[in-house]
Amino acid sequence: MARSLKKGPFVDDHVMKKVIAAKKVNDGKPIKTWSRRSTIIPDMIGLTFNVHNGKSFIPVYITENHIGYKLGEFAPTRTFKGHKGSVQKKIGK
């Protein structure tokens, strides 16, 4: 179910404080965050976030196309290594 429009997009308070501080300083340092659930809003354009994927931090540069998505959508948590059985069958034949 989609979020109500009257509520507005969800952004964690600590992330919003870091965004406001980064806009004032404008030094280009990435913002380190574990908040994958925060929605990307227009105030974040031009900033880089280091989003935690459960193991490491993935750098995400925010552009206009990212608005409305969540930060976690750009930091995948799973890596697909492939199905080993299909490779073995091709080599054997």
From Swiss-Prot:
rRNA-binding as a keyword of this entry, yes or no, is: yes
- Name the Gene Ontology biological process terms: ribosomal small subunit assembly; translation
Instruction: Give the source's domain of life in one word.
Output: Bacteria
Annotated Gene Ontology MF terms? rRNA binding; structural constituent of ribosome
Give the UniProt keywords, A-Z.
Ribonucleoprotein, Ribosomal protein, RNA-binding, rRNA-binding
- NAD as a keyword of this entry, yes or no, is no
Q: Which GO terms describe its cellular component?
A: cytoplasm; small ribosomal subunit
Function of the molecule:
Protein S19 forms a complex with S13 that binds strongly to the 16S ribosomal RNA.
The text of the family note is:
Belongs to the universal ribosomal protein uS19 family.
Question: Under what name is this protein listed?
Answer: Small ribosomal subunit protein uS19
Q: State the organism named in the record.
A: Campylobacter lari (strain RM2100 / D67 / ATCC BAA-1060)
Q: What is the lineage of its organism?
A: Bacteria, Pseudomonadati, Campylobacterota, Epsilonproteobacteria, Campylobacterales
